[in-house]
């Protein structure tokens, strides 16, 4: 049988692998319509593949090709975000607002994704290809108060669900940064257990102790820095910072 996503010679993607640009649900509710977004993502992948194999004028180029792997559970750039005692905003990042509970730094641009206009020509409101628009910022330390819930006493968060706005998430959400925040949360959790307190009590009462743990880190300091690509095209370190 044939899929019906409307592919033709002009609208089909002549590719042999996926890229970050394949992104569905940009005009949908990322939480309430998550199942639809996943299903539509699978639909366009298999629809495009079916067209290339069966109906494309140059289908012989794909005759001996087969799909090796398609993720059933796709990666999410954005979904639920929880509210902490501080909500990080675009203004915080752009104006480099300094907070006394600074933790791990983000080193990426404010990277926001939108439907690709070329894809919109054929799939208006049902786009599955994206473009990104990046705003350069200085590397910015995430406040500790973004890493725990303001209304659930014993809950930390450290990934793409931390207390930030949609725009601020554009720089925070990359894996190396969320990994660093995970380390911070682990350190803070150890202090909560040690001192028998909730996450909110760490700042300011035990924050100096947390700072010492963060300065010590958990990595091997003698290893070379091979993660420069994670720094994006930032404005470089901010000078005259307290």
Where are these regions (language model features)?
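Flavin (FAD/FMN)-binding glycine-rich loop and adjacent Rossmann-like elements that form
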Residues: 1-242
């Amino acid at each position: 049988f044939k899929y019906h996503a409307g592919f033709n010679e002009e609208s089909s993607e002549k590719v042999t692998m996926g890229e970050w640009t394949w992104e569905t649900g940009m005009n949908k509710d990322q939480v309430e319509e998550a199942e639809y977004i996943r299903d539509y993502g699978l639909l366009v992948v298999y629809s495009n593949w079916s067209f290339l194999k069966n109906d494309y004028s140059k289908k012989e180029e794909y005759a001996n090709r087969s799909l090796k792997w398609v993720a059933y559970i796709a990666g999410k750039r954005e979904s639920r975000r929880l509210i902490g005692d501080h909500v990080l905003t675009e203004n915080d990042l752009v104006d480099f607002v300094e907070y006394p509970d600074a933790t791990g730094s983000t080193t990426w641009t404010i990277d926001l994704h939108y439907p690709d206009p070329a894809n919109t020509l054929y799939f208006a409101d049902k786009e599955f290809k994206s473009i990104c628009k990046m705003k350069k910022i200085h590397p910015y330390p995430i406040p500790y108060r973004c890493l725990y819930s303001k209304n659930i006493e014993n809950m930390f968060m450290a990934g793409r669900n931390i207390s930030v706005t949609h725009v601020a998430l554009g720089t925070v959400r990359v894996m190396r940064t969320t990994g660093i925040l995970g380390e911070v949360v682990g350190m803070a959790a150890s202090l909560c257990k040690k001192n028998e307190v909730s996450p909110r009590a760490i700042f300011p009462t035990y924050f100096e102790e947390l700072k010492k743990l963060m300065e010590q880190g958990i990595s091997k300091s003698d290893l070379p820095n091979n993660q420069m690509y994670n720094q994006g095209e930032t404005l470089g370190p901010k000078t005259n910072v307290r």
